[in-house]
Amino acid sequence: MSLDIITPPATTPISRAELKTHLRVDTTAEDDYIDTVILAATDYFQQRSWRQLITATYGLYLDEFPTDYIEFPKAPLQSITSIVYEDTNGSTQTWSSSLYEVDVKADVGRLRPIDGESFPGTDTVYNAVTITFKAGYGDAATDVPDLVRSTIKLIGAYFYENRQNILTTGSVSEIPVPMALGHLINQFSLREFV
């Protein structure tokens, strides 16, 4: 299984003005850096929680369909755009949405064939199945839960005050944060994918 972002979010869960107010910064000298901090804090939260905060479109690639159901590695799942696969003859097919059902209410979105149906057979190639889906709380920052937005501000403040951590770490998700921030993130974490 692999995951690729197709259409990134159009905005961030907090604005520059919100983080500047939180930081008590009233100059414009560091606006570009603050924008970078917002992106890093958002990325950190999303990587650690397996959640997508603002609506984005993803491609999920599978070598074959499972036998029972598919769980989506980004939540909350909004919708399935398409399911395309290579059939056993090597031809590209689109699986009709009338043949499967989607659970967008569960913490981890799921998809399975409707009763009486089964997943189609696939060719024995890598990434034979491509599922395009949308995930996120919504299109606007105000759609994101307030506790998540507050957590992003706290992570952003930590990154702002500890700049060397952002510059010396290979991956945003490897940056150490205070234990309290880790606990806030864990409240939203989808542990099945960690």
Go through each PLM region and give its residues.
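Divalent metal-cofactor coordination and adjacent catalytic microenvironments
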Residues: M1-V194
